[in-house]
Amino acid sequence: MDTTIIEKRICLYSKFLDSNYEQHILNKANQDTKNECSQKYGFIIHILKIIDIIDHEINRVNADNVFTVKFEAETLKPEPDKIFRGSVCMIYKDGVFINVLDKQKILIPAYTLTDDYDFNQEKHIYVGKDDTDNIIKEGTVLSVKITASQYNNLNFSCFGTIV
């Protein structure tokens, strides 16, 4: 995961303009960005802190307060050569899917596994060629290096290799 500085507009009802307004803005920003994914930042996992409140205006339609806020956030952006840890969530003869933080699934194609692993069709697991105790099964935690990623329809599609 990375730490990224993001600038965003946050709407806040007037009832939240009290002595804890910064905490209310932080809570609303976390709520608004939950499950958000953009090509620029990737997945916003959690907003850590507000760095600056740049601007404030009142919406003419509904009188909500609109703040332009710069904040620091933990992000997950799957780009080539980045390494992530995740657990195996699906195994097929054609490859393995790794789930990273319940946000991103990464496909490890079978051709990247064939030098080190054999697929056991009966048990749906990959078994190490040199070490039969080295098993890839659902729930196994692995480190994965992204080899390719593409952003489309508010999500990333990723390929990777085990590191």
Language-model features, listed with the residues they occupy:
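Single-stranded RNA-binding regions, centering on S1/OB-family and related RNA-binding modules
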Residues: 1-163
